[in-house]
């Protein structure tokens, strides 16, 4: 009987201890990835990109924007969900610097930044700037996405504050892989429209790449050989540009998490420092 009496106090004791005023606050929910649909200005087709707002987002405060371009065969979700080092690094950098994070389809799984993809990305940037207080726009990507980042930055340097390209090509006239996909994207073969291939080759336009720029390469990369990107970096160094090259002679077609973070950190820190300098 005495034993039962003592047990009867347990619910009351628990109720007193777990008073509503002392209850733990529920964990803060991370912002959900938004799958955004829009109508492309260039051809009125429906296109998509993924948007992630930072946890500390405020519509009244300026935020910088990081756009991540997927590789050949992937789509807008690669840099949002993929656990590989390049993608995790981009997501972690966006969190660290409180960046708005966007990953577009830019037309196709095999886009290579042709005219339609270029138009879509320009439209996305303009629409995001009209909706949010965008301070600076950073561009990154791996493989096809890295190549496309260099292409877009050379075509629209006024829109981009920094570029981090992982395992890219900088010369489409020289590059020979994935030609069927590139021809579909660019609108013909390099023999038919050499000017279009040159236009989309960053190596030919170093004077336009005035923003901080970083590249990671693998010396044993046969998918996207590193030679043109090395040449581009050397030219930019001659022009006294702010550049970083991480060249791993024994690596293939990949960039580690640490190297991916390093090239992203470089462009953000250099661009931020450049932005804070008083006008001369």
Question: Where are these predicted regions, by residue range?
Answer:
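A domain-start/cap signature at the N-terminus of enzymes
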Residues: 21-63, 182, 192-195, 243, ...
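Short beta-strand/loop motif that positions the catalytic acidic residue
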Residues: 209, 215-217, 221
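Short substrate-entry loop that stabilizes the transition state in hydrolases
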Residues: 58-63, 68-112
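Mobile cap/lid helix-loop segments that gate and shape the active-site cleft of serine hydrolases
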Residues: 78-85, 168-205, 211
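C-terminal catalytic histidine-bearing segment of alpha/beta-hydrolase fold enzymes
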Residues: 113, 223-280
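Alpha/beta-hydrolase active-site loop
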Residues: 112-131
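Primarily recognizes the serine-hydrolase "nucleophile elbow" in alpha/beta-hydrolase
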Residues: 130, 135-181
